[in-house]
């Protein structure tokens, strides 16, 4: 799973560069996310999912596992959810667990 990270003063933005997070890639995604978040001290971690067209239950579980792996003082936020991925979060009520930003990371400059 290819992920690209960009760190600012108080936010680490991680962009998923594949079109799906599923059973075949969930473990690799989770391990890479833990590596990237472990190398950062930013209190906010934003996962840009704008290129993710498909997310199955394994992928959703991997995103939740990343959230649980962060220190209690850090937040995992999501951005750029496609309609299909947004539906998965809504149907599973995970949209109440995560802060979800509309659009991509450009809109995060003004997000609080």
Predicted regions and their residues:
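Residues that form or immediately flank small-molecule/cofactor binding pockets and catalytic motifs
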Residues: 8-10, 83, 105
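STAS-typified acidic loop motif
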Residues: 5-31
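Short histidine
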Residues: 16, 34, 107
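Amphipathic alpha-helical interaction surfaces in cytosolic regulatory modules
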Residues: 21-98
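Short secondary-structure boundary/capping segments
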Residues: 3-5, 13, 68, 90
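Non-catalytic signal-transmission and effector/linker regions of two-component phosphorelay proteins
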Residues: 1-5, 109-112
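Polar low-complexity intrinsically disordered regions enriched in Ser/Thr and small residues
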Residues: 11, 64, 106-110
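Short acidic-hydrophobic, aromatic-tinged amphipathic segments that line or gate anion-handling sites
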Residues: 99-103, 107
């Amino acid at each position: 799973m290819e992920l690209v990270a960009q760190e600012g003063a108080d936010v680490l933005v991680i962009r998923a560069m594949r079109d799906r997070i599923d059973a075949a890639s969930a473990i690799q995604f989770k391990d890479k996310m833990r590596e990237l978040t472990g190398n950062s001290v930013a209190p906010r971690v934003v996962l840009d999912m704008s290129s993710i067209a498909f997310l199955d239950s394994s992928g959703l579980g991997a995103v939740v596992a990343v959230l649980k792996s962060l220190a209690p003082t850090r937040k995992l936020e999501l951005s750029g959810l496609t309609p299909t991925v947004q539906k998965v979060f809504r149907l599973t009520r995970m949209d109440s667990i995560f802060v979800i930003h509309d659009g991509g990371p450009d809109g995060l400059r003004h997000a609080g």
